[in-house]
Regions:
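Gram-positive cell-envelope targeting signals
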Residues: 1-42, 50-51, 103, 163, ...
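A detector of tandemly repeated sequence units and domain arrays
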Residues: 33, 37-38, 45-49, 53-58, ...
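N-terminal segments that cap or nucleate solenoid repeat domains
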Residues: 64-125, 471-483
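All-beta strand scaffolds that present successive hydrophobic residues in beta-strands
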Residues: 85-90, 109-115, 146-150, 170-176, ...
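Disordered, low-complexity segments in secreted/periplasmic proteins that are enriched in proline
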Residues: 26-74, 299, 358-363
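Post-signal-peptide, soluble extracytosolic/periplasmic N-terminal scaffold domains
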Residues: 106-182, 189-200, 217
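Extracellular beta-strand/beta-solenoid scaffold signature
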Residues: 67-77, 97-104, 125-140, 157-164, ...
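Extracellular beta-solenoid/beta-roll
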Residues: 341, 366, 370, 374-479
């Protein structure tokens, strides 16, 4: 019989290939993962930190981006790396390479006095690796402690932060001058859980995305006492908060951005500080603000309640409204703060959804849940809320609020079941300057117009609940007590 040798050879080759393949699988070749399990290895491992610019930090005021981006570096390049107890006095560390630290501390107790640290580079990367991990900072501590006193730190490089604390690193900086020039170059900076203490610093930043007091993904702790902190760039607030930050007796100035920006589950406390901002009117924003608490959805901060506390001192706004909260849960507490608003101030407080072009939540569903408490406070301007938000506004301890309360549904889509509750204690008053709308009014104090005339209160059907003499009317769903 005549054999078909081509067919026999093909069959033999197929059997061999099947045997080799089975052997490889038996040795542990992972192949494709089973359904419901992520692939392993470099190709399937997500970056440790997703991309996304910090709110209020990106150039031209771009507050927040999308996920994607860089992971933690395997190592850092530095002019001097220290990993044991060391004292450096009167030294000069000059870094000129791309993405290099002048001083890197990984362990030990390192003390730097009367020294100069500089970073000058035209080809540094900046961006996420600088913001999240301190790549290219003049001084970076990732472990141990770094103490800097009576020194000068100057950077002129993208990503050239002054002093950066990351991870378990702790930095203490006192009586020192920090001057940064290029973008993504905060003055003092924490991320990834770092800790930084600052006392009597003079800090100035000139680049975009370069808050004088800056934090980023992974947060941390900052305690600042005294000093002057000035940021000049666009998208560079004086203070950018994705950490827990406490500041006292400091001058905080932003000349080209909002004064302070807080995102997500973080907190800032200001005591006897002078805070000022001058944010530009930008087409990508649906309003302009001085202090913002929000959630950008960039992944830079854990979702949760942001807390802003300010006692004593002053707040100055050179453009736009004062306090804005959107797409988040937030809590504001003001006590005896001297507030100066711009001539074109749009509002004292805005608690609404947004139509921001960068996508802060889903339009029509991105309101805010806000508790705002004022004590011993003068408040002037409009309070704005919408039905996809919940605002609980309390006037306490002799607070005087002069303005209107308005329901603005322009960013509320199809609306919701939210509302505004206004509570006025027996020592406080509301001086009404226009027709107002409040969901629930609890008043043990005074409600009058600028001429001292009582204001009529009606329900949503127009029924008079409390007759007044003023031309203005307050519309409520619920009146818990009668205004005096």
């Amino acid at each position: 019989m005549k054999r078909n040798w081509k067919r026999i050879n093909a069959l033999f080759l197929a059997i061999c290939l099947l045997f080799v393949s089975s052997f490889a699988l038996a040795e542990g070749n992972p192949g494709n993962p089973p359904d419901g399990q992520p692939p392993q290895g470099q190709g399937g491992t997500p970056p440790e930190k997703p991309d996304g610019e910090a709110p209020g930090e990106p150039p031209a005021g771009d507050m927040g981006g999308g996920p994607g981006g860089s992971s933690q570096p395997d190592s850092y390049a530095a002019v001097q790396t220290v990993s044991e107890d060391t004292q450096l006095s009167g030294v000069t560390l000059d870094s000129v390479a791309a993405d290099e630290n002048a001083l890197l501390v990984t362990a030990g107790n390192v003390q730097v006095t009367d020294s100069t640290l500089t970073r000058n580079s035209t080809d540094s990367t900046g961006g996420d690796s600088a913001s999240f991990y301190g790549v290219g900072a003049a001084a970076l501590v990732t472990g141990g402690t770094l103490k800097i006193r009576n020194s000068t730190i100057t950077t002129d490089a993208n990503g050239g932060a002054g002093v950066f604390a990351y991870g378990s690193g702790v930095a203490t900086v006192a009586d020192t001058t920090i001057d940064t020039t290029q973008d993504t170059s905060g003055g003092i900076h924490v991320a990834g859980g770092g800790t930084l203490y600052a006392s009597n610093l003079t800090v100035i930043t000139r680049g975009n995305s370069s808050a004088a007091i800056r934090s980023d993904r992974g947060g941390g702790t900052m305690v600042v006492d005294g000093g002057s902190y000035t940021s000049e760039g666009s998208g560079s607030p004086a203070v950018y908060v994705t950490a827990d930050i406490t500041i006292s007796n400091a001058q905080l100035t932003a000349t080209g951005s909002e004064a302070l920006c807080l995102e997500g589950l973080n907190s800032v406390s200001l005591t006897d500080c002078q805070l000022s901002g001058n944010m530009a009117d930008l087409s990508q924003n649906d309003n302009t603000w001085t202090v913002i608490l929000y959630q950008s959805m960039s992944g830079d901060s854990e979702v949760g309640k942001g807390t802003f506390t300010m006692e004593g001192g002053s707040l100055t706004s050179l453009n736009g409204g004062l306090f804005y909260t959107t797409n988040t849960e937030s809590e504001f507490t003001l006590r005896n703060v001297q507030i100066t608003a711009s001539d074109d101030c749009e509002y004292f407080l805005r608690c609404t959804g947004n139509q921001n072009q960068r996508g802060w939540g889903q339009s029509g569903q991105n309101g805010a849940d806000c508790v705002f408490t004022a004590a011993q406070q003068e408040m002037n301007g409009n309070v704005i809320w919408d039905s996809i938000s919940n605002l609980d506004l309390s006037l306490t301890e002799g607070t005087v609020f002069t303005g209107t309360v308005l329901d603005d549904e322009s960013c509320a889509g199809n609306g919701g079941n939210g509302g505004c509750t206004l509570t006025i204690d027996e020592s406080s008053s509301w001086v009404v300057t226009g027709n107002s709308v409040v969901t629930t009014l609890n008043c043990s104090g005074s409600i009058v117009d600028a001429e001292g005339r009582t204001v009529t209160i009606v329900d949503s059907n127009g029924n008079v609940l409390s007759e007044g003499e003023s031309e203005y009317t307050i519309t409520v769903n619920t009146l818990q007590s009668t205004a005096a």
